[in-house]
């Protein structure tokens, strides 16, 4: 039979359950129970347990009923002693006794284990009062709070004493004296703060930094400036830099599976930063700058600390409507800057200070400004956290204004392609008295815009981010700008041809005046008179002067291969014009010599370009200026060529360095009047 003390305890707590403020009473009463050894009690069968449950239920249902009608002569059955009930009460008693001595982590772990056992253990006879588990849980919670508060105080004191926390010394070298502290941290690493749910150590450790953050950036302090997110990001980075060495000493402690403790520290402070971000994103005026600084912060975390977990930019973009609003603001900002670039009064002026950055032409100011505008967005593009974000940003903020810019330039190209009389805006409205040379300048500047854009795109397309974007679009060779580059290539080649056309339209009238001379056939001078004139023809001076001016202009506006190609093309054009003059006129010896002097004067203007040899022109004037002499050399050469006596001709050509074909040489020789005179 069960002892009267046990019966009274069970009976009392069945009828009067413990209340939430009776934890100490529970401890006292359970401690005072005199419990028999459970092993001395019989093991009940399932049928006996069922019967016990029914009896207990009956007794509970009878509580408070009037029993006068019951037959008092029938004695009550004795209360049996049940092993299940006693075993459960033994666990409660052990649990209560341990709650009095929780001075070590091991003791608390043992205490916690007993509570876990209580949580799963039940009295199958259902005799033990139901309130026991409830009040035991309250006891556990109370003791847990007390112990954790004690540990937090201990952590705080040791951190201050050993590490001068929170002003942690970043150059910790002697780690052996800290082993005891880290052993303590390791022993409680699985325990969470009751209020925040954070690991107990981390809750203690981050508290002063969180308080500093809130004080400076979430209060009425002057450091709380919405337009300066870089201030609180720099504060966080400074905190991380000063604490990194400390966390290296405890890198084997894991508060969360797979997460180094230093990253846990960063995560927790980033959570505070998220509160700040959600406040700033309400203001459109600050959103673009906020995103840029958040991206830069994430980059610096990765560069300095190899941290890639939970980027704040993802949190920012996932706030309702924030990403779309930011992208719209970035797009509008780029288009506004583009309009400012186009309408600037100095847009078409040369940016000579930037010429070293380009290999084909001296850029206009608007080209440099447009390039700089796009390049300032590159770091944002590169640092965005996913390809989808990057693609959308590139399409809206880079490609869209680029297409508009090219369309705008193409309109000028089409106007000039159909008529060379249409002026470009800004500084290109030059003096009409110099319209001819100004047209060359305009075409060079138009060409430089197309060419430099083309070269610049070739350079930046090798960046990984553009390769990934090109791959996403499925473009050939993964070229991100495949939509615009073919157009730029066509416009570049076309505007280069327009430079040559403008040069031709400027020079050709002057050379036509020269070719209209009727003095090529001049009577031979008297015997003994000087054959050669001492100066070039007056009529060639205007052509030479304008040619010199054009070459100087091209040297000013074009660079490298573009400059060489343009001047080579002009040299070839001039050579063909001069040869055409020869082939459409007749020359005396004196006229041929004069033409040769004029031609040499023109060739000298190209002396900076040794690859331009003018071999056809030089060979032509060499034959054209031959003296007849007594041997009738001109006629002899004609006869030898006609008779195909090429040995003599080859030897003569070699001596004079003539490279013309026999047919072309014959044509030049016939231009001499003495070739057909007796």
Curated annotation (Swiss-Prot):
The gene is tip20. Transmembrane segments: none annotated. Coiled coil: none annotated. One of its GO terms (biological process) is retrograde vesicle-mediated transport, Golgi to endoplasmic reticulum. Required for protein transport between the Golgi and the endoplasmic reticulum. May contribute to tethering of coatomer-coated retrograde transport vesicles to the ER membrane through interaction with and stabilization of the SNARE complex. Keywords: Endoplasmic reticulum, ER-Golgi transport, Membrane, Protein transport, Transport. It comes from Schizosaccharomyces pombe (strain 972 / ATCC 24843). It is found in: Endoplasmic reticulum membrane. Residues 99-678 form the RINT1/TIP20 domain. The lineage of its organism: Eukaryota, Fungi, Dikarya, Ascomycota, Taphrinomycotina. GO terms for cellular component: cytosol; Dsl1/NZR complex; endoplasmic reticulum membrane; nucleus. Component of a peripheral membrane protein complex consisting of dsl1, sec39/dsl3 and tip20. Bound to a SNARE complex consisting of ufe1, use1, sec20 and sec22 or ykt6 through direct interaction of tip20 with sec20. Interacts with dsl1, sec39/dsl3 and the cytoplasmic domain of sec20. This is Protein transport protein tip20. It is a peripheral membrane protein.
